[in-house]
């Protein structure tokens, strides 16, 4: 459900970070410097916790390393809600998640934080969210039509563009964190526990995201990443849904994950990426990476997915799944891509 950055261990670094080439993102690079510390300085906020008397737990719906998630009931309004009970974790991390959710409140397709409560006896903190009647992605994705896929990916991009426009990277986009009420055609992006404010030229932990959706920058210990990490994860999701191969890049560990990516995108562009940023391969890669030519997307087409594949979606994947994070399409650019033409035309 959720995970957390593990403290970085210097001896595990794959290359020295000095003399690295840093390129700022195409858009929203200076959002936080314009907004100022009162917007992004979560460590110094004072939270006002309410008591949990108005909420009742109905049933458990999920758990992660750092929380347990329940369907709940607001006993005053009789509305369903979701209760995320946080396990003991650093106060700083809790403050960050809450500050980000508060900053994004009202944004398109962003899960709404309704309340924050703390049990007076146990001091256990909980976050109260709006309820979404979600269908598990393993059940839902195989049933989606191409129109459904366009609609939901567009809604996800809309959430992502808003989040980035507010100076925030999600850093854990994956099917488990995208709630879909298919009957009502509602999508919500959840689990902001790994989200972080973007500041230019700041080093970030590479121990974020979930393996199958990790961008190459995380796998090669490139710490000066930015919003473009999220578009890689969306590209992985889109490829998985379109080709009915979930997860699309199925690595057994972080090293193997990059190998799985290289077997599709080829090793030539990967070497180019390393040269551009002055990166060095970890010794572990020397033996396992090999040489691979770029595979055309048509190699993944078969009789069960061919009705979903088009030149437009393959072109969009080409623009999302790019080693060099600075060359990836942005969410706003992606929303203008011809793949979404009928969605845009219908919403006018």
From Swiss-Prot:
ATP binds at residues 61-69, 84. This is Casein kinase II subunit alpha. GO terms for molecular function: ATP binding; protein serine kinase activity; protein serine/threonine kinase activity. It comes from Theileria annulata. It catalyses: L-seryl-[protein] + ATP = O-phospho-L-seryl-[protein] + ADP + H(+); L-threonyl-[protein] + ATP = O-phospho-L-threonyl-[protein] + ADP + H(+). SMART domains: S_TKc. It comes from the Eukaryota. The active site is at 172 (proton acceptor). Its EC number is 2.7.11.1. GO terms for biological process: regulation of cell cycle. It is found in: Cytoplasm. Residues 55-340 form the Protein kinase domain. CDD domains: STKc_CK2_alpha. One of its GO terms (cellular component) is cytosol. Its main location: cytoplasm.
């Amino acid at each position: 459900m959720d995970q957390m950055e593990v403290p970085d261990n210097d001896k595990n670094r794959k290359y020295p970070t000095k003399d690295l080439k840093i390129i700022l993102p195409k858009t929203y690079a200076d959002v936080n410097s314009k907004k100022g510390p009162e917007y992004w300085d979560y460590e110094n906020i004072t939270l006002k916790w309410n008591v949990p008397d108005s909420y009742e737990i109905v049933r458990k719906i999920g758990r992660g390393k750092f929380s347990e998630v329940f369907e709940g009931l607001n006993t005053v309004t009789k509305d369903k809600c979701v209760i995320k009970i946080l396990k003991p974790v650093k106060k700083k991390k809790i403050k960050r998640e809450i500050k980000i959710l508060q900053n994004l409140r009202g944004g398109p397709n962003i899960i709404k934080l309704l309340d924050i409560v703390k049990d007076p006896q146990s001091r256990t903190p909980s976050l109260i969210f709006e309820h979404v009647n979600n269908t598990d992605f393993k059940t839902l994705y195989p049933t989606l039509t191409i129109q459904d896929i366009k609609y939901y990916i567009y809604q996800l991009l809309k959430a992502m563009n808003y989040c980035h426009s507010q100076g925030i990277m999600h850093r854990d986009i994956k099917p488990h964190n995208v709630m879909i009420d298919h009957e009502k055609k509602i999508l919500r992006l959840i689990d902001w526990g790994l989200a972080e404010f973007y500041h230019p030229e700041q080093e970030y932990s590479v121990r974020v995201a979930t393996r199958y959706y990790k961008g190459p920058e995380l796998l090669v210990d490139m710490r000066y990443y930015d919003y473009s990490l999220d578009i890689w994860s969306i590209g992985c999701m889109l490829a998985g849904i379109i080709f009915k191969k979930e997860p699309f890049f199925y690595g057994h560990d972080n090293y193997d994950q990059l190998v799985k990516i290289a077997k599709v995108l080829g090793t030539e562009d990967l070497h180019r990426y390393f040269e551009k940023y002055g990166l060095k391969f970890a010794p572990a890669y020397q033996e396992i990476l090999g040489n691979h030519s770029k595979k055309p997307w048509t190699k993944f087409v078969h009789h069960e997915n061919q009705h979903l594949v088009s030149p437009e979606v393959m072109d969009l994947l080409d623009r999302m799944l790019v080693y060099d994070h600075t060359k990836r399409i942005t969410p706003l650019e992606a929303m203008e891509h011809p793949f979404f033409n009928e969605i845009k035309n219908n919403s006018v």
